[in-house]
Amino acid sequence: MISGPFLHFDPTVPLQTVMIGHPATSPLSLPSSSSSPTVADPSNIHCRVCERRYDGSQHFGIDICRACAAFFRRSVAVKKTFVCRRGTNKCELNTVSRKTTCQKCRWMRCLLVGLNVDAVVGRRSPDHVKTTSRDESVKKEDEESDTGSEGKSCEDMDVSHPIEQFQQQISFSVHRPIPTIGNPNIYTTRASLINKVLINYNEFTKSRLDVELSLKHMQQDSKVFGSTGIPIVPATREIISEIYQKQFGLLHIFLKNTFDEYAECDVQEQKRICAMFYPVLWEIESCYWTYRNMPVQPEYETLMMCTQTTYIDSKNVRYWLGNTTGLNESDIQAVEARLENLLTKARNLVLEPMHKLIIKEFEFITLLALNIWAPRNHRGCVSEDRAEQVRDALFDDLHYLYCDGLKIDKYSSRMGEMMCLHTEVQNADMSSTIKNILFSDLNAYLYSI
């Protein structure tokens, strides 16, 4: 009898509880239908900065409320630096009144969720869209209460130095993408599937990060800090194997809550889909996280993000191998050469096109979803027709986002570049190398549960 997490997953259980056994605050509660026009209950959507419930719109490409977007824009425009009066840098932001909210902690949270200082152009978010009349009163109330919360006491604020104080902690400048779609109202937009994938993926990513931060590799001293302030340490075989085995159940929950087509498959077919997708997931995510976190500078050009808290240096892959006692030196050198070649290919074929395209978050999400349901992964299988239906829905949504979201009249060139990138990701040689080098242990684990 098959045992293990595939027989015990309950999508209503908080993800952190499933994987690391402590209480969580945000379960995946979205409906499982891929085609439903209603993506989420508005009462369950919260700003990623202040954690208040809001209408689900994006500002600067991030799921934050108008008040926090306005706070961030003003803070950058007038070069404000804040001080936490409690001295903890961990203040509660979802307070009764914004006037009592700690602005230092609010600012740090803005940077943590991915808001980019360089995106503030002309004191206005590049993806700013005029709100409809039904939202005007809400916007006015939010911004008025937010204005008063910035504080005029010198105890709260020092306007003499811009953003360098926090950036010094991060230690390097960061190349970040242009924000995402212009008007992603997730309740009325026709692009329901892409938005649903995006919302569930963000929850999936957050839950995986919680797992990583709980593991012992985070106790290393040799850390660097990306744009989010999350510590990143050198990866080893053992670390990566432990991380992916602990996170595997979260992938199943993400797919089951996002795609009806996956939920309808039997256990063995679900395992097959996961096994096929994991190498491609690493390929896309590692390049995208590198694109988001690593600066475009010569000293970082050999670094590739491996997970959210680890990286591999293509010039020091022996460190990744870890303990090689008892192994033949020629075998070690052969693995080193294959890994170096893999990282170079990933950078040239996937990462560089992302930089050239200045890929947006919804395009990354679309690329991810297309590779879950790629034809080569389902040809001749029971899920072949289901995969075709998902791809049709994704392309319809992508058309809508380009036309009505970004307002691009002639988007054929951009769509073509996206499909070229999709083709590179589908490179069979790269996927098989990733599977053999990075996921050989995971495949054995997957089919043993």
UniProtKB/Swiss-Prot annotation:
Keywords: DNA-binding, Metal-binding, Nucleus, Receptor, Transcription, Transcription regulation, Zinc, Zinc-finger. Residues 44-122 bind DNA. GO terms for molecular function: DNA-binding transcription factor activity; nuclear receptor activity; RNA polymerase II transcription regulatory region sequence-specific DNA binding; zinc ion binding. GO terms for cellular component: nucleus. A zinc finger (NR C4-type) spans 47-68, 84-105. This is Nuclear hormone receptor family member nhr-43. The keyword Transcription applies. GO terms for biological process: regulation of transcription by RNA polymerase II. Residues 125-142 have a biased composition (Basic and acidic residues). SUPFAM superfamilies: Glucocorticoid receptor-like (DNA-binding domain), Nuclear receptor ligand-binding domain. Residues 200-449 form the NR LBD domain. It is found in: Nucleus. Ligand-activated transcription factor. Positively modulates expression of homeobox protein lin-39, perhaps by binding to the sequence motif 5'-TGAC-3' in regulatory regions of the lin-39 gene, acting in the embryo, and also in the vulval lineage. InterPro entries: NHR-like_dom_sf, NR5-like, Nucl_hrmn_rcpt_lig-bd, Znf_hrmn_rcpt, Znf_NHR/GATA. Pfam families: Hormone_recep, zf-C4. Disruption phenotype: RNAi-mediated knockdown reduces expression of homeobox protein lin-39 in vulval precursor cells at the larval L3 stage. Residues 125-154 are annotated as: Disordered. Disulfide bonds: none annotated. Its main location: nucleus.
